[in-house]
Amino acid sequence: MSRQSKMPFPSPQPETEPTLGFTIWISLRRGISPQAEQVFERSLADYMDSRDLQWWGTHLCAAVSGDDRDLTETDQVDLLLWLVEGVTPTTVEIGPLGPGTGLPARRDSVPVVRAQSSDLMLIPMIWLYRAARVDARQVLQMLGGFSTISTVH
């Protein structure tokens, strides 16, 4: 099993108000083998461990929080971009935790930011973010902000 090594993401500007955590939903590529899904799950666990992030749920829907800290927009964007750069996920959505629960929110009940690996605009966005030309908040805004309520089919 190979581990993806990525350059650390810069944090060019002061962070905005931290949050306790967020919910993440991941849609995998169709026809993925069980072995490839296990490799993805392990890679995700390694990513979370390397950044002192805790997650409750599955590798497809989880609540993410900091080990001993609140999370910021940079934490959200770093994870989102790491996921869409991979081969396995096709769509990644990030939203708030369930109101008052600290658990993953229902996908159709909260506003989300959505990124799809097939979106060619992500490539320059990732480059600009890594070059510290845009910050995490700007990336979230370019992706549409937390304005869309996901429709589950």
What kind of region is each of these model predictions?
Residues 1-153:
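Long, contiguous binding/interaction regions
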